[in-house]
Amino acid sequence: GIALASIIINKTFDEQMIRHMILNSLRMYHKRYKEEYGEMILAVDASNNWRRKTFPQYKANRKKDRGTSTFDWNEAFRILNKIREEIAENFPYTVIRVDGCEADDIIGTLVTMNPDHNNDFKPQKYMIVSSDRDFLQLQRFRNVRQFSPLLKKELSVDNPRVYLQNHIIRGDKGDGIPNILSEDNVFVEGFRQKPMSQKKVDEIIQDLEDGELLYAASWYRNYCRNKKLIDLSETPPELRREIINNFMADKPDTRWMRRGKVYPYLVANRCNPVSYTHLTLPTKSSG
């Protein structure tokens, strides 16, 4: 997301410049957070999105807008995919891409992989580097924080559970998800959503807490629709297992061996190796 935004803002398809920009960003965040949060994990969107299969209107307008845009989206994604593959092959970062999943699914799965419900041990701490507020729901876990590269500050929310309920009820226009009072096709057909006041939101939250006769509520079907799409705990179990398997497969000794590829890669791509000595294998001293 960070890299794509930079391409759009700078209006450049200079592959070398984009490569430098991405590598510099990764190096900066790796050095900033490694000591407290451990090794960097790169979560990448894949094709065959399961949400679109569940709800065909999901992000439908984005695809339509890209089809009419003068911006060369195919070239942008070609460059980003190429650099992503280079990083996975030549750097000691764990890169996870699972067919059918968005990066959101990967992050939402990994931060819950070792839950600490009883507070009897210290779970792995996570710093999510993203400006996407969809991740605020994950702050219900005390080991999760988020930094926004766009705002250059940490994002936080007082009550992540209430935040998630509000998000589900109000929907997400950017992702083509209507509020729970509106029909599935409201955005793709260009209709207006039914108005949703905060008073109505609060009433629905109270009904959900009471838990009585929810199936009879006119909005309950759409609430379930939105929860499936927005709540990151709803990622299908088979995809969660594949995410965890991918993560576990990238063992420390495998990452260590990739350090031997960093220096040749940087030289071949005219990057300054001196800035990346923390990622390369130590050289033997002479004598």
Spans of model-derived segments:
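Catalytic core of IPPT-family isopentenyl/dimethylallyl transferases
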Residues: Y265, N269-S275
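Short, polar loop motifs at secondary-structure junctions
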Residues: S131-F135
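Helix-hairpin-helix
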Residues: L164-A216
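Noncatalytic, basic helical substrate-engagement surface that gates or grips nucleic-acid strands
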Residues: G1-M127, Q137-K153, D231, P237-E238, ...
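Glycine- and acidic-residue-rich phosphate-binding/metal-coordinating active-site segment common to enzymes
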Residues: S148-R170
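Conserved small/polar residues in nucleotide/adenosyl-binding loops
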Residues: T277-T283
